[in-house]
Amino acid sequence: MDAIKGSELQIPDAIFAWVLDGQGGVKPLADDDIIDKDKPCWLHLNYTHSDSADWLAATPLLPNNVRDALAGESTRPRVTRIGDGALITLRCINGSTDERPDQLVAMRLYMDERLIVSTRQRKVLALDDVLGDLKEGNGPTDGGSWLVEVCDALTDHASEFIEQLHDRIIDLEDDLLDQQVPPRGFLALLRKQLIVMRRYMAPQRDVYARLASERLPWMSDDQRRRMQDIAERLGRGLDEIDSCIARTAIMSDEIAQIMQESLARRTYTMSLMAMVFLPSTFLTGLFGVNLGGIPGNSWHLGFSLFCLMLVVVIGGVAWWLHRSKWL
């Protein structure tokens, strides 16, 4: 392939444009730089910015279908080989476990041995790890190692998020053992996060496995082995997600049972109270509607004696319920 001039990659509103120095570091792209396989260029764009969108639509450095894909709508993770290059769509975890599980942040990239063009709309936090290593001189040295490092960082963020969800499930299980029911919607949010993760991470694992098996000329055998390790690590995370989804289903049944038992206890308590006060209610009603006059109304101890009789009746009913083991 012919070398690319740095002036062809100068975009005013690019997020950044770096040239890998081949020793683990980077330097800003200059107009007189010559971009080749030994010193590839990483161009990171926000495809909603006007200059970046215009460059993507007009540059002859990218195939037509690649230009459309880099500025297109979000899709599930996938990889398409185009000659010696690859068009890749990946997903990154950006939020915390307290946030609603919006669609994971999408990053699209096209790369060959000379050029790496990545696009996004929202910030991809995992790229900060790779950028930090490059600025310290400990980063990738070529396109193949760059792709491995990016996929590794994405998997690290996904694994950390899955671990946080797993810890929350453990805490929730401990609370349920103590008969503590979580707030309404808590378990639904947790389950939704797991399902969204499963939806996007499963094809992303397949992307990693595909990259490990593709004989791309700018990836070495060692890099392909590392990519396979990353795919297997994400696969273990998916197994953990499946386990967590099953556990949330069990917890949902447990919460329903706890709520049903709580309602049954309240209903039972109200029934017992009705049984205790039913005789006294009957007596007071009977005395109150006596058309011939309330018995004992002319005796000064009549009301006191009636109250004492009610206490005896209530006590007798309570004793009978206790003896019958209803209380």
From Swiss-Prot:
An MF annotation (GO) of this entry: cobalt ion transmembrane transporter activity
Gene Ontology CC entries for this record: plasma membrane
Localization per Swiss-Prot or TrEMBL: Cell inner membrane
CDD domains: ZntB-like_1
Keywords, comma-separated and alphabetical: Cell inner membrane, Cell membrane, Ion transport, Membrane, Transmembrane, Transmembrane helix, Transport, Zinc
InterPro entries: CorA_cytoplasmic_dom, CorA_TM1_TM2, MgTranspt_CorA/ZnTranspt_ZntB, Zn_transp_ZntB
Zinc as UniProt keyword: yes
Keyword Ribonucleoprotein found: no
Principal subcellular localization: membrane
Periplasmic side: 295-300
Membrane topology reported for the UniProt record: Multi-pass membrane protein
Domain of life: Bacteria
Pfam families reported in the protein's UniProt record: CorA
Cytoplasmic face of the membrane: 1-273, 322-327
Role summary: Zinc transporter. Acts as a Zn(2+):proton symporter, which likely mediates zinc ion uptake.
Homology family: Belongs to the CorA metal ion transporter (MIT) (TC 1.A.35) family.
Protein name as catalogued: Zinc transport protein ZntB
Source organism per UniProt: Klebsiella pneumoniae subsp. pneumoniae (strain ATCC 700721 / MGH 78578)
Gene that this polypeptide is encoded by: zntB
